Amino acid sequence: MSKNLNIHFHNISIIGSAKTRFSFSPSKNFSEFRDYNDENPSDLDIVLVSQTLFDDTWTAFREISNQKHICNYSQKTSEIFRQFISIKDSDERYENEHIKDWLKKVMSLKAEMQTRFQIYLDINYRIYKNWEAVEEYHIKGIEKLKNQVIETK
């Protein structure tokens, strides 16, 4: 994965229920990890930390926004403000070379993970600018979950 994405292996991490067995997402209420054979299987969530990739992707979206409307603009800008970017397989490519090249790499990697490692879960990822942004995002989610637990007692 590290070689395919050109990101140091220390800057790639599995998170979420695939790592902890339970989801810490406030909206999922500690749901347990479900394998691909189970009904409604869980996703595999991956953190990618690369300031260069974050900056290049942000630049690509700025260039795109100068030419046309970006789908889910408010979500994208909210993510960038929090120093991460999510790109889904189904997202518009906008005829931007950086976005198209990145999605080609990711699609190839996902196919390899399925054939080589028999990982058939949907794979989601976020590109973070740095580890501080990862920490801040996940601490806020855990705090929300903690407050929900306290409120229901």
Question: Where does each model-flagged region fall?
Answer:
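Catalytic core of pol beta-like nucleotidyltransferases
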Residues: 1-42, 49-153
